[in-house]
């Protein structure tokens, strides 16, 4: 099937385990049905011929045969489970390897929690379709054919009854199997509910503070209602067929007793009928299990299809709009040039025909309202996205001409939301430069103003962040991030609102760290706190993806400019105080 072709592509070296699982499962089915044939011969000796001594040897053979069938099924399951676990591992590895090479755009658009959930949960969803369904589907196909053959060996009546059961059971089974499109919608609603639940839990502080109920979170509430509806509809669609299915198989013997007793004419015929009833009881149970396996097979195939399609869509998205790198490793200089650059997010234009130059060694601030394009400019310089039109150059060469390693080494990015790993403070800084010595790392920590942070902990730079109650404030995290950037020693520094939410206690230390980081570098700073950019060489004011003003703080403040009005609004907001006076 198509699903297995997709899945086995990720376990080429272990594909033989699937073949072995099918072979052992088929042998198990043959042994199991042959075991029931021996049971029939045993009952024939015992009931019809009353030959107890002959029945004993057959009984022993049937026990050995059925036990052998169970062992072969266990071995089949062992093969398929090894294959299933290897598949899950490889799907997760494929995701992790893809993350290492993914475009910056991918990380910009996809939260880390969502990525982890998609990879982990969908890899786990493939387990049933491989580990359980490979042996079960083999038995579900082979066993009914063998059971029907055995039924006709017992008697024409038994064969006809089992054939009728097979036909009716197959029709009922078809009614119980969900349509592929419906199952896809059901899976999507379940994924949506899981994602919204995570967001709801993350916002639990807000929920408690404002005593908000679940209806207040519209997307979460809608996800609950949608999933509830689809789960209820699916249950209702299966209710009648499933009840009829169980009634058909489990009530069959009771249904047959009355006509059998009515047509029974002698003790001999009673013995034959009793034997047939017992065999119908046994063989209908085997058919019931086979049909149930087919039903689960349909459901797990739908789950597996959805899981692998979701994962492959994620893998594809990782490479989407990825900057194709060249092989240039050296920069002539670090001047940055935009030439008629246009860029759009999902067909929504953000920057159109933008051109400007930034000189090496100077510091620049990008200011403007939300959506003006300043963050997009910074991300385009870093190679987060491919431009739709035009080109971006560093040192007179398009950034796409540089190798990946050269571009990463040349540019450091300091984000507003600092990310630190659950490792020591030292390791969090040292990862910026694998060749750095301990003296280099400690110097970077000192220049970033981290001495006061280290003094708080007995183990200083060896303190593990996030363990034993060790947690850092936003400003402290930012200083460690700056130490990392100092150690990397890139020639271009991009700071995306790096001081936007820093508390006053940390601001002074942070500003000193910024000065050490920015020394002799080309700096692009995106700032909302306009007080932090007055000393920069040049301020670039953006609006609707265009540069509307450019100059030093002194130049722009001396004229009637948009920048001047932004500074006045910023200063006015800072002067505002909450008073105890009643506002009339």
What are these regions (language model features)?
Residues 512, 529, 534-584:
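C-terminal portion of ABC ATPase nucleotide-binding domains
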Residues 382:
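Helix-to-loop junction immediately C-terminal to a conserved catalytic motif
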Residues 11, 415-467, 489-494, 505, ...:
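Conserved "ABC signature" C-loop
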Residues 1-31, 52-58, 80, 125, ...:
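Membrane-integrated ABC transporters
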Residues 16-32, 47-88, 275-282, 289:
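Transmembrane-helix motif of ABC transporter permease domains
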Residues 193, 212, 239, 287-316, ...:
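Cytosolic ends of transmembrane helices, especially the final helix of ABC transmembrane type-1 domains
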Residues 9-16, 104, 121-130, 134, ...:
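An intracellular "coupling" helix at the cytosolic face of ABC transporter transmembrane type-1 domains
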Residues 27-41, 68-71, 135-177, 236-284:
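A hydrophobic transmembrane-helix motif
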């Amino acid at each position: 099937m198509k699903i297995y072709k997709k899945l086995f592509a990720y376990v080429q070296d272990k594909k033989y385990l699937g073949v072995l699982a099918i072979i052992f499962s088929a042998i198990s089915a043959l042994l199991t049905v042959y075991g029931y044939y021996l049971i029939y011969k045993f009952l024939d000796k015992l009931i019809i011929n009353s030959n107890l001594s002959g029945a004993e040897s057959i009984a022993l053979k049937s026990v050995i045969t059925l036990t052998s069938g169970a062992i072969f099924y266990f071995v089949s399951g062992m093969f398929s489970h090894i294959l299933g676990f290897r598949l899950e591992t490889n799907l997760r590895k494929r995701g992790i390897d893809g993350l290492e090479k993914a475009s910056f755009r991918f990380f910009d658009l996809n939260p880390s929690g969502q990525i982890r959930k998609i990879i982990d949960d969908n890899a786990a969803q493939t387990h049933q379709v491989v580990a359980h369904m490979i042996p079960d589907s083999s038995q579900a196909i082979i066993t009914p054919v063998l059971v029907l053959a055995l039924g006709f060996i017992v008697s024409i009546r038994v064969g006809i009854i089992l054939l009728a059961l097979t036909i009716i059971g197959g029709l009922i089974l078809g009614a119980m199997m969900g349509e592929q499109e419906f199952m896809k919608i059901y899976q999507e609603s379940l994924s949506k509910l899981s994602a919204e639940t995570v967001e709801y839990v993350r916002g639990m502080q807000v929920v408690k503070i404002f005593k908000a109920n679940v209806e207040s979170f519209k997307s979460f509430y809608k996800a609950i209602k949608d999933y509830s509806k689809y789960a209820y509809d699916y249950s209702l669609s299966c209710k009648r067929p499933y009840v009829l299915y169980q009634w058909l198989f489990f009530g069959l013997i009771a249904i047959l007793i009355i006509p059998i007793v009515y047509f029974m004419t002698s003790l001999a015929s009673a013995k034959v009928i009793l034997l047939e009833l017992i065999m119908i009881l046994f063989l209908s149970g085997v058919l019931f299990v086979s049909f149930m396996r087919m039903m689960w097979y349909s459901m797990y195939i739908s789950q597996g299809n959805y899981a692998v399609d979701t994962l492959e869509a994620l893998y594809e998205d990782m490479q989407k709009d990825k900057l194709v790198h060249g092989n240039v490793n050296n920069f002539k200089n670090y001047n940055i040039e935009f030439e008629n650059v246009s860029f759009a997010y999902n067909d929504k234009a953000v920057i159109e025909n933008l051109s400007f130059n930034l000189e090496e060694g100077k510091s620049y601030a990008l200011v403007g309202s939300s959506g003006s394009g300043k963050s997009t400019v910074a991300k385009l310089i870093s190679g987060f996205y491919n431009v739709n039109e035009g080109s971006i150059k560093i040192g007179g060469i398009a950034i796409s001409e540089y190798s990946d390693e050269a571009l990463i080494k040349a540019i450091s990015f300091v984000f507003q939301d600092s990310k630190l790993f659950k490792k020591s403070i030292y390791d969090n800084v040292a990862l910026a430069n694998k060749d750095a010595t301990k003296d280099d790392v400690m110097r970077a920590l000192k220049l970033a103003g981290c001495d006061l942070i280290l003094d708080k902990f007995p183990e200083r730079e060896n303190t593990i962040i996030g363990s034993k109650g060790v947690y850092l404030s936003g400003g402290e995290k930012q200083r460690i991030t700056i130490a990392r950037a100092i150690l990397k020693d890139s020639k271009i520094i991009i700071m995306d609102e790096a001081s936007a939410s820093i508390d006053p206690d940390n601001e002074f230390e942070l500003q000193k760290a910024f000065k050490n980081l920015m020394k002799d570098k080309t700096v692009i700073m995106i700032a909302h706190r306009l007080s932090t950019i007055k000393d920069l060489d040049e301020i670039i004011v953006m609006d609707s993806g265009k540069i509307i003003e450019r100059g030093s703080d002194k130049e722009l403040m001396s004229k009637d400019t948009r920048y001047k009005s932004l500074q006045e609004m910023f200063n006015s907001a800072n002067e505002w105080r909450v008073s105890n006076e009643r506002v009339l």
